[in-house]
């Protein structure tokens, strides 16, 4: 009986914790991040689209991230950014793929640095910094295409829709 009561209480606490994490009144810092890879992303030497690896780095400050080179950020960001690095995550997108992520950001993180491992680094925008609002939900949509990674805004979408119809 005691064991059943403890398990019931743990279950209820789990439900309450889950509700707090999705509540609009939550004090967590959250990031809803949508990533879309174009059909022609990250072409190889033969012009074939290829998967692209994306690293998300939670940062206290973006300055050192913005000044570091790709290989440092990609292979040893934690060591290269000791005062700014908080956490990181890696994912891979295939050409034409879309991912929607719901992330809880660490309380000390103020920015998320995006590093996209393009094959042709000198000719693309491979780095991006996203500010995150403390104890709020930040929503961002990113597009990874032939020119690099960029924030995909509703205005850009309407403009692209208009041009597609002409």
Regions found by a protein language model. Give the residues of each.
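C-terminal motif of bacterial Sec signal peptides marking the signal peptidase cleavage site
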Residues: 15-18
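Tryptophan-paired
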Residues: 68-105
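Short amphipathic, basic-aromatic surface patches that mediate peripheral association
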Residues: 34-45
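A short, solvent-exposed beta-strand micro-motif common in secreted/extracellular proteins
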Residues: 109-119
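Bacterial signal peptide processing site
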Residues: 20-23
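Extracellular beta-sheet/turn segments enriched in Thr/Pro/Gly and aliphatic residues
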Residues: 38-40, 131-166
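Short coil-to-beta strand junction motifs in C2/discoidin
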Residues: 46-55
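Bacterial N-terminal signal peptides that target proteins for export
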Residues: 1-9
């Amino acid at each position: 009986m005691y064991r059943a009561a403890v398990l019931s209480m743990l279950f209820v606490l789990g439900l309450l914790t889950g509700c707090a994490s999705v509540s609009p009144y939550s004090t967590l810092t959250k990031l809803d991040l949508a990533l879309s890879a174009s059909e022609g992303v990250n072409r190889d030497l033969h012009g074939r689209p290829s998967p692209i690896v994306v690293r998300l780095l939670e940062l206290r400050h973006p300055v050192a991230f913005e000044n570091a080179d790709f290989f440092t950020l990609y292979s040893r960001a934690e060591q290269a950014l000791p005062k700014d690095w908080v956490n990181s995550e890696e994912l891979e997108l295939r050409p034409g793929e879309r991912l929607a992520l719901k992330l809880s950001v660490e309380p000390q993180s103020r920015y998320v640095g995006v590093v996209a491992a393009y094959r042709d680094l000198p000719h693309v925008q491979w780095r991006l910094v996203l500010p995150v609002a403390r104890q709020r939900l930040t929503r961002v949509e990113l597009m990874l295409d032939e020119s690099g990674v960029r924030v995909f805004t509703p205005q850009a979408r309407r403009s692209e829709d208009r041009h597609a119809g002409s």
